[in-house]
């Protein structure tokens, strides 16, 4: 069962989002003119949709510096609780069984863990770099002793958790294949319970557009949950998709144009999927 959960940012979070997005838009054009990589800009925009803590860590430890970062960092430090975290707590209070929470960023993962532990939940973290035996150990501890497993993207490979039937996407990757991989951790052979997928998305942000693209345009969740249909898109195309999304966000002059360009992108992706399915 798919649950798309809207989250309204707090006033400070919304201001932070607008500051970051404004910087990204301005810097995008400068880099395009100088043929400079925009990968960091994609990262900043994704981090602010994940959590203020992910952005704070990136800007504090990054090699780049711009004067506006001072204002962004000061505001990020004022934010102690994210609106998404409050929503997760609401969801968890109404769930039966164990839950896996996915996030793309380690700083967000640590924030979620500390918050939930203070609320009395038994939490375990899962990251990349573990051996197969290490992964099996974490899986065993989660199954036997913990309520919630919080995993980063890097940790999801080779993780089979069919004993768990609740999954919360704390943030939404811009790559549909990563969503598919997340869901595949629990929606697989051996799963005996109904699977609940909770997709958090922040209103009036790029995240809302991403969910609409994945859910409405390419029917990602219906495809994966229904028949475990694989997304047949190569890594280069997915890399270009992230650039396309940022370009749309920056170049659209108004909300109508933003909607129109995302609709066109969705139609294009659906066309690619249909073509590649016919080749198989």
Where does each model-flagged region fall?
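C-terminal accessory region of SF2 helicases/translocases
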Residues: 193-280
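SF2 helicase motor core recognition
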Residues: 109-110, 149-165, 183-191
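Conserved nucleotide-binding/hydrolysis micro-motifs of P-loop NTPases
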Residues: 10-14, 48, 54-55, 62, ...
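A short beta-strand element within the Helicase C-terminal
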Residues: 159-172, 195-199
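Inter-lobe connector of SF1/SF2 helicase motors
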Residues: 1-74, 118, 240-280
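Alpha-helical elements of the RecA-like P-loop NTPase motor core of helicases
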Residues: 15, 57, 110, 114, ...
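Conserved Helicase C-terminal RecA-like lobe
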Residues: 2-9, 43-147
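Conserved SF2 helicase motif VI
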Residues: 175-197, 214
């Amino acid at each position: 069962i798919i649950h798309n959960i809207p989250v309204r940012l707090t006033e400070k979070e919304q201001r932070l989002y607008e500051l970051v997005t404004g910087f990204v838009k301005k810097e995008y054009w400068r880099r395009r003119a100088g043929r400079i990589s925009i990968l960091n800009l994609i990262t900043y925009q994704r981090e602010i949709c994940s959590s203020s803590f992910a952005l704070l860590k990136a800007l504090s430890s990054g090699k780049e510096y711009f004067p506006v970062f001072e204002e962004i960092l000061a505001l990020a430090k004022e934010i102690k609780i994210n609106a998404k975290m409050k929503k997760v707590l609401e969801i968890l209070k109404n769930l039966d069984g164990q839950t896996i929470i996915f996030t793309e960023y380690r700083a967000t993962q640590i924030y979620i863990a500390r918050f939930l532990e203070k609320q009395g939940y038994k939490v375990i973290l899962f990251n990349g770099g573990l051996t197969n035996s290490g992964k099996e150990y974490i899986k065993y501890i989660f199954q036997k002793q913990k309520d919630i497993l919080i995993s980063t993207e890097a940790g999801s490979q080779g993780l089979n958790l069919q004993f768990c039937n609740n999954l919360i996407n704390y943030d939404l990757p811009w790559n549909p294949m990563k969503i598919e991989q997340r869901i595949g951790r629990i929606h697989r052979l051996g799963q005996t319970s109904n699977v609940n997928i909770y997709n958090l998305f922040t209103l009036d942000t790029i995240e809302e557009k991403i969910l609409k693209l994945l859910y409405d345009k390419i029917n990602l969740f219906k495809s994966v949950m229904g028949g475990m249909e694989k997304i047949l898109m190569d890594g280069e195309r997915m890399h270009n998709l992230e650039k396309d999304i940022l370009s749309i966000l920056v170049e659209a002059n108004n909300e109508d144009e933003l909607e129109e360009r995302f609709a066109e992108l969705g139609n294009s992706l659906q066309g690619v999927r249909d073509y590649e399915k016919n080749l198989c």
